[in-house]
Amino acid sequence: MKNILLMCSAGMSTSIMVKKMTEAAAEINAEVAIKAIPEQQLNDHLAGTDIILLGPQVRFLLDKVQSAAKDIPVRVIDTMDYGTMNGEKILRQALAILGES
């Protein structure tokens, strides 16, 4: 089971993305747990996280999150994929980074 953490300013738009990614995971039988958090809760959710995906609106936090995350991969979600809520593509990219594709 891979744990994917999505982060945005308030956790609202990423909660929709969690739903889309969870649906995509079910379709491809990927064993993942996906959750969305606001940026203020990052440190509370690092333990057990395999990858952190940042919403495009918080891309300016990339260096800060990478520093806090240490060895956890951190990526910014593509603006177009985020805007169109392409959960399948984002999930597949995360799994590829984790070597699960």
Segment roles from a protein language model:
Residues S15-V18, R59-D63:
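Short, surface-exposed alpha-helical segments at coil->helix boundaries
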Residues N3, R75-S101:
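Ser/Thr/Gly-rich flexible loops in soluble cytosolic domains mediating phosphotransfer, phosphorylation
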Residues A36, L54, V76-D78:
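Structural signal for conserved beta-strand scaffold positions within catalytic alpha/beta enzyme cores
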